[in-house]
Amino acid sequence: MEMVDNRQGLMKMLVKELGFTEKQVRHVIQLTEEGNTVPFIARYRKEWTGSLDEVQIRAILERWQYMMQLEDRKEEVLRLIGEKGKLTEELRRHIVTATKLQEVEDLYRPYKEKRRTKATIAKEKGLEPLAEWLLLYKKENPAEKAMEFVDGEKEVESAEDALQGAQDIIAELVSDNASYRSWIRNTTFRKGIMSSSVKDKEKDEKNIYEMYYDYEEPLQKIVPHRVLAMNRGEKEDVLRVSVVTPIEEINQFLHKKMIRDEASKSAHYVQLAIEDGYKRLIQPSIEREIRKELTETAEEQAIHIFSENLRNLLLQPPMKGKVVLAVDPAYRTGCKLSVVDDTGKVLNIDVIYPHPPVRKYEDAKKKVLSIIDKYQVEMIAIGNGTASRETEEFIVDVLQNVKRDVFYIIVNEAGASVYSASDLAREEFPDLQVEERSAVSIGRRLQDPLAELVKIDPKSVGVGQYQHDVSQKRLNESLTFVVETAVNQVGVNVNTASVALLQYVSGLSKTVAKNIVAKREEDGKFTKRTELKKIPRLGAKTYEQCIGFLRILEGANPLDRTGIHPEQYKNVELLLKSLGLSKNDVGKPNLQKSLEGVDVSKLSQETEIGEPTLVDIIDALISPERDMRDELPKPLLKKGILKLEDLKRGMELEGTVRNVVDFGAFVDIGVKQDGLVHISKLSKQFVKHPLDVVSVGKIVKVWVDDIDTKKGRVALSMLPIE
């Protein structure tokens, strides 16, 4: 009964903390404990959750998990202290009402099994009574009292030795006091300073950490990316980093708390113990805790930025139905070419040498023109790696000889080389060379960014900030969640999807994804959703979780084309029948006419389908193959080229956001180097974070602010240059 009450109490705390209703929180936890996935709950249990999205559901679950860990730790600490016979009612109350793991650890500290410390050694020598006597602040001389504890056998050779041991015990007593630690931690955070100085300049060859050679910033104000930069500089042995604390104020606080009689001769020894306890035990420990907390906050921010950038990259609009010529640029080894048809099938692989040292420019030109003509190429995708700009110039020259409209796009090829050398790429294209696979990946990345990018480790897609400096476990969890959310929001064509894409579908594991592809290759395309029930290891619960996200576009049942879950098919058929329609009318104008402007509230009562679900069903019936990505702005199509030398201050351009970081955004304006829009130049209004204004893949209007041709750098502004 106590556990049930405790759960309800924790849920109420969660409601207060996150601002959701008790019903929403309770249902999210219940649905998850019943084995439902986040995408499934978000899409198909809207009546239960009040239409919470994936991010909100995850926030509830993460906080709930922390609370459960906290409760487990409280129970363990209560048991451990209880076994020692030292659990008072007051201590129990403090532990039970603690809201952070750190508070529980502070309360447990005095009772923790310690390794041998100065204090434990002093206690072994029988000096605890002397420490207790000092804290009584009697009028007697402590040096005389200490003589009673001199004992050669116990290695207490003098009164000084005895007093030192007693001070060590008092120092640890001060350090173990939970309320003192809490006050010191809060005061240090409010008034402390993060400081860095140069340790070994020689190790900073590129002067990356120059601004931190002599740097100070209040702990309360330091921004996340500076915390991570300092940490990295310290790790690379370039910087010395520390927390400067308000020592005087802290010592005064401890003095006031510990010394009850200034006139007593004991006060001097207790003061020495306080100062030692703070400097030797509390300060290093609090500094570690604060730096750990700042690092965790900074890591969360870096992970959040990476996740947002990745989400925007994955959800870039696909260029559907286009025959694409992809070019993976290079100098010496030549530019690899790949033609992929409108389904992503590879039609042609080739190589050209338009650049030095080989430079067969005219031959390369003829070959590309022939390919464009033969395969009726509509788009050219150029990877943005080595030799990208020179290749762009070459393609622009080629296109001048093409009479119809053929556009080109610079495609972010980050991770393409990682993918092309992977086992997955070898399985997919066993007969192709690594560079040839890379060209195919670039072309397909333009046609369907999501389907292609899921094949690559998210950490390799080139939109992170300090991703190697953060908790890899936490980063992987967050990025996997982003990919899963994107894949399930878009939906998957079960007859064309790769294992890499299917494994992110709600409820599916990599093994089941492989089984689906194996069955498809063996028996041909699936014609109805129910056929998936025959897949090995795809049980009833897995089927329920995944099936709504898997589409069959040319199947026997038109509802299988949609995002409508089969659990609603009977209701949907009754709904259509009541309107004089059938499932064969899905997506047709007559159905659209019948459903547009319908009274959803009234229809919901008549059909017993919840309103939020009914709205989704109506949308799916009207636009069965709707892709949320199609509503976003298409990538920037190009025909001409721009050089760094062409740029002038104040020039107005359009560009594509390639990466967003704490201090601004990098924008591809068509020159060799992406330009930086500093956070201060993003908007006339105050911008708390660049992500509030821009996102990866967004097309933005910018003005050239400054050009450094020597370093190849361009500063941009999203505000007109006056």
Each model region followed by its residue ranges:
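Long, charge-rich intrinsically disordered scaffolds of nucleic-acid metabolism proteins
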Residues: E103, I409, G415, S420-V490, ...
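Accessory alpha-helical DNA-binding modules that contact the DNA backbone or grooves
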Residues: T37-V38, T49, D53-V156, Q489-E631, ...
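Generic start-of-chain signal for non-secretory N-termini
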Residues: M1-R26, E33
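Long, charged amphipathic helices and adjacent flexible linkers at domain junctions
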Residues: E289-S307, S460-G491, S604-R649
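C-terminal accessory/binding modules appended to enzymatic or scaffolding proteins
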Residues: G19, P317-P318, E484-A518, K639-V677, ...
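Low-complexity, acidic/Ser/Thr- and charged residue-rich accessory regions of DNA metabolism proteins
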Residues: M147-A159, Y215-E216, V244-I247, N251-Y278, ...
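Duplex nucleic acid-engaging cores and interfaces of nucleic-acid transaction enzymes
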Residues: Q56-A59, Y66-A326, R332-S420, L424-D431, ...
